[in-house]
């Protein structure tokens, strides 16, 4: 499902697969494939909440923090009463609580950072600081999906 450092399936399909394996684990807690099932849950969870190099969940571009398709899939998980539901809910809250602040920050000039004016450097630093704060919070939240 990951090809050339990008998802070859939609975020919605990743969410469906995560929910399938979490349901399988809950329905069959003593199954013979427990290690493999746990591996699938971690992989699909990481793919949903983090994405991959060419299909990121978090974008931090001028107008948005996260990919809208990814956020719809995360919403599906958040209302599913699954094992990942609390993580998805906290992820949504984190993005939502920072969305307005991100959108209100001044935009960078788009010129190479080496040629920034002091004002543009300050704007870039503000955006970088918020991005790093959000990434740190996301990393903390997603520890259950780390390998």
What residue ranges belong to the model's regions?
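Short, charged, amphipathic alpha-helical segments
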Residues: 34-39, 61-64, 89-92
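Short coil/linker segments at helix-helix boundaries
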Residues: 1-15, 47-79, 109-116
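Extended, charged, solvent-exposed helical/coil segments
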Residues: 101-111
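Short solvent-exposed coil/turn linkers within tandem alpha-helical repeat scaffolds
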Residues: 24-36, 76-88
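Long amphipathic alpha-helical segments with strong coiled-coil/leucine-zipper propensity
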Residues: 1-33, 40
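Membrane-proximal bilayer-interacting regions
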Residues: 85-93, 112-116, 121-125
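Short, low-complexity, Pro/Ser/Thr/Gly-rich segments in the mature regions of secreted, periplasmic
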Residues: 130-147
């Amino acid at each position: 499902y990951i090809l050339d450092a990008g998802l070859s399936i939609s975020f919605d399909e990743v969410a469906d697969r995560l929910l399938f394996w979490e349901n399988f684990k809950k329905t069959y807690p003593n199954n013979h494939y427990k290690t493999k099932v746990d591996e699938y849950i971690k992989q699909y969870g990481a793919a949903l909440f983090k994405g991959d190099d060419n299909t990121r969940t978090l974008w931090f571009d001028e107008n948005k923090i996260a990919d809208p398709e990814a956020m719809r899939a995360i919403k599906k998980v958040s209302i599913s009463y699954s094992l990942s539901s609390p993580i998805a809910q906290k992820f949504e809250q984190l993005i939502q609580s920072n969305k307005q602040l991100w959108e209100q920050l001044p935009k960078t000039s788009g010129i190479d950072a080496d040629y920034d004016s002091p004002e543009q450097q300050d704007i870039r630093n503000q955006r970088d600081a918020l991005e790093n704060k959000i990434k740190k919070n996301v990393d903390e939240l997603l520890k259950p999906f780390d390998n």
